[in-house]
Amino acid sequence: MDLASKDSYIQRLASKVISQPDQERKKKQFAYPQGKRYNGPLNNNKKKGNRKSFKEKDTRGKTPGFPKKSLSSIQPTQKGAANKNGQKAQTQSINGSSTQALEGGNESKFSTVDILRKRLHEKIEESRGQGAPKDALSEAVQAKRAKRKLERERKKRKRKEFRMKELAQQNVEEQQPELKPKAVCESAATKRNVQAIIFNKVEMVEEGYVDKVQKKKNKKQSMKGNITPLTGKNYKQLLSRVEARNAKLEGLREKDEAKARDLEEKIKWTNLLYKAEGIKIKDDEEMLRTALKKKEQKRAQRKKKWAELSGNLAEKMQQRQDKRTRNIQKRKQLKTEKKKNKARKKGRVLPEDLKKAAV
């Protein structure tokens, strides 16, 4: 049970205790004749045996408990009984405190709700750690307080130092003049020259659209001595070009040997220039023939392999189709046989059975 529920329970209990005596019927004040005095409370109730009595509990030196029966009535004084000296009649309350009847019959009602509420608030404060400790001046408490004080001072000092550092840094920054770096736009070529190695960097060179005519012009300009280089992997075309060039040289040599020699030298120099640029020149007739032969052999092998593969594939497909048709026929026969057996069981005579019987 938590403290809030305890508090609500105690308040309900106290309200019952207080409200129960008040619920009794209030009696009208009786005016006594002159010469007579008040000797005690009147008791007009004839049924004295029905009245409840207090259960006296000695709770001296103990915290008040919560009794099972919260309602208790005070024993009434006998009719006409009065003390000459005005003695005090004591009755025990729920929490052990006594209520005293003063002289002249004026009763002082002692409220238990305030005491219970006070004790509950004290317990709540103790549980939160806000209440005053029992031994306020004990060594442990003093040591704890001193430790907390030192910690607070240390944190305060640290904050102050940090603030001072920040202020000093701001002053230094303000004193230094602001130097704006000059924005220098360097070209991609100069960057490449300055930085020999560039990692994780791709420089895109913007090139305009080049049409076919311009491409042809560029190709002609790149050609050296109006002689196209013999490059590529189309060995058949290269071989035909080499054969045509050799035939041209032979024809020119028959007419003019000097011109043929000049053309040969020109071809050699242009080939050397192309090779210097990194272009591989394929002008050897024998090597071109062997390369062409190898290429044709590979092509023939691939063709043969493909034919075998396609033939095997067609054969396999036909086998699968035949197997499928056989399985379908078998299933149909089984179905018809099943139907015939059912008919025979029912007593039907089939033409097949008659033929067998005749034989």
Curated annotation (Swiss-Prot):
One of its GO terms (biological process) is ribosomal large subunit biogenesis. Belongs to the SURF6 family. It is found in: Nucleus, Nucleolus. InterPro entries: Rrp14/SURF6_C, SURF6. GO terms for molecular function: DNA binding; RNA binding. Pfam families: SURF6. This is Surfeit locus protein 6 homolog. Residues 144-160, 295-305, 326-348 have a biased composition (Basic residues). It comes from the Eukaryota. Residues 15-106, 124-160, 295-359 are annotated as: Disordered. GO terms for cellular component: nucleolus. Its main location: nucleus. The keyword Nucleus applies. Involved in a nucleolar function. Residues 70-101 have a biased composition (Polar residues). Residues 349-359 have a biased composition (Basic and acidic residues). Keywords: Nucleus. It comes from Takifugu rubripes (Japanese pufferfish).
